[in-house]
Amino acid sequence: QHEIENFVPRTYWELKTIYRDTLFSAQLPVEEDDYAITSLEQGQTLVDSIKDLPLEITSVEKKKGTEYAPRLFDLTSLQVECNKKFSLSADDTLKIIQSLYEKHVTTYPRVDTTYLSDDIYPKIPATLQGIKDYFPQVAPLLPLKADGKKGAGSLPKSKKVFDNKKVTDHHAIIPTGQRPDNLSELERKVYNLVALRFIAAFYPDCEVSNTTILAKSGD
């Protein structure tokens, strides 16, 4: 808390270059809590000193990993996401998601959990069916059965989504399956966030490959 209260914003510059369609960001030797390039002139001087030098690749590292679907929304995480994407205040987001609830297109909004209870699982296919005309991403999920089994043909039931121990009176915010007609522009945007987050929860985990390339120019 002390560090937050005493934080002083500072302007700094970053040095980047594109080489063979790849963006490289410079790592400069700096002292802790200090910035290497504190003025535009300093940055330009550095660029001029290395712009005619060759860029030497020093290492290439590839790592495979798994990217999981983001958790379903509780009220706080929805407010954060709406502020990030649409610059909505927390109060504005609450008013919009409350309106969507009153229109019966999303579930109760004032929740602090990102999980669903087990009794929701058998209802998922009907919810997906109700919003299929609005989201083409639903199509691959429609043939899946909510039978709790693992493997092809079954709707996933992940502990990252379903956990009775982490649900009290109300579960995470999800679509109800009612047709989301007659929504305002902002209501549509917030509804889409909720619906797409819900749909993503039933997609397979994404296998990703990250490549880190280190290069140097000059000494």
Residue map of PLM features:
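Core catalytic DNA strand-manipulation module of type IA topoisomerases
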Residues: Q1-D219
